[in-house]
Design a protein with these regions (language model features):
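Mid-domain alpha/beta scaffold segments of enzyme catalytic cores
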Residues: 1-230
Length: 230
């Protein structure tokens, strides 16, 4: 509810999503999802998410997320994460709301699950992508999905500046910050904030060999397309 209130306070700047982050999936995940589902139902709206699709968009939220799988710290709730992820993927299919997907040390498991629903998925974002060309190509085999690229791309050790132009067209990227984490250079090590996305833009525009204006225009269009922000 606080997220919705914030989005109403800053219309056109803050947009709400709803979902259970994998790091929050514990033994009580079913209860947590039941509460989120209740909120989702409370915010049904009329109209179509896609004029060419008879499936109605039923929520004030713009996406189901941030959801996914995270096995970096622990696999204690591995099965619970898989089940919670699958349930929320079904929400996305039902509502036609795109997915915002978090995946850490679990791409094989994530892809295996998504393949089961590939023809039904409305699209979304693979958030905070830091993988290689092969991994990027695998994720982009899902139609209407884009890669979210953040501050890691500005790090000296990052291979993204080479791998992305080689494997990912500009119309399959959106810019992110993942605030308050992973601040881009020259703010690395400090608290990240959304305003720092300009540094990601500068880095990727240079990597793709285009102007910052052109890259910004394209990635803004990508955001509007994925989240149906017309």
């Amino acid at each position: 509810h606080a997220v919705l209130a914030l989005s109403r306070e800053y219309p056109g700047y803050a947009y709400p999503m709803i979902g259970l982050h994998p790091e929050e999936v514990k033994a009580d995940w079913k209860d947590q999802l039941a509460e989120l589902r209740k909120i989702l139902e409370e915010h049904r709206i009329t109209g179509n998410a896609n004029p060419a699709d008879d499936s109605p968009r039923i929520s004030d939220f713009i996406a189901i997320g941030e959801i996914g799988l995270d096995y970096y710290w622990s696999r204690e709730f591995e099965q619970e994460q898989l089940e919670a992820f699958e349930e929320q993927v079904k929400w996305s299919i039902e509502t036609r709301l795109p997915l915002m997907i978090h995946c850490r040390k679990a791409q094989n498991e994530m892809v295996h699950l998504l393949r089961q629903y590939q023809k039904e998925l409305p699209g979304g974002v693979f958030h905070c992508f830091t993988g290689n060309q092969k991994e990027a190509e695998e994720l982009l085999s899902f139609d209407n999905f884009v890669l979210g690229i953040g501050g890691v791309s500005t790090f000296k050790s990052s291979h993204l500046r080479e791998d992305l132009p080689a494997a990912v067209p500009m119309n399959r990227i959106i810019l992110e910050t993942d605030s308050p984490y992973m601040a881009p250079v020259p703010y690395r090590g400090k608290r990240n904030e959304s305003a720092f996305v300009i540094e990601v833009l500068k880095t990727l525009a240079k990597a793709y060999g285009v102007s910052e204006e052109e890259f910004a225009e394209q990635t803004n269009k990508n955001v509007e397309s994925v989240f149906q922000l017309n």
